Amino acid sequence: MLTVRLVGKTILASLLIEEARKLQSVTAVFFYCKYHDPQRDSFLAVARSLLWQLLRHDGKLQQDNDLLAFFYENVAASGDESLQSIKLAKDMLTIAIQKFDKVYIILDGLDECPVKEKKLISSWFCDVVDGCYDTEAEAMRCLFISQDDNDCGKLLGRLPTVKVSSSDNNSDILAFCHSWEKQIQLKFYLPEPEVQFIGTEVAKRAGGKDTVLGEEDKSNMV
């Protein structure tokens, strides 16, 4: 179990997820929390997404008819169209995780959840990982990535922590800005000194925080 507290975290989370999914011996699942989004800021939202990913991972769980029957019967018995019970979500997720030899879970943006949900998410995953250590230490790994707020600091204080400040991101952001200079220069016919100034100024104003560009933003630049 590890927590990473930093600014400009989303790109780092994406890179870690990409690398984890390349590992042949590991089942890597992930979730991006989002502030004030009911579909992405609660334990139930996390559990639903992770269950879906585990079920789709490589067909292993889809071939387990007993497990699928268990999931279906319990959700059907609840009378809800979707998974709404926190207790049932915990039970289903625990059983699903145990079906795999090694699971890596990456949760980005815990700080964007309400305090109650932060507590629920962090405490449950900590308990599950601790349980794995009692039986098979390599069975599960969990990484929390968040801004360094007071709540997460208290909830995850006992975990190994890597702190990344804005100054740690500056060189990467500057390199990214410089990589776009040539394309900007070709489109707007700018002299070399001016386009270099733009790249340096954008990096400076970013303040160490990453900016994710959509496809429309990129097309407007090139």
Name each model feature, range by range:
Residues 1-222:
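Conserved NB-ARC/NACHT P-loop NTPase core of NLR-like innate immune receptors
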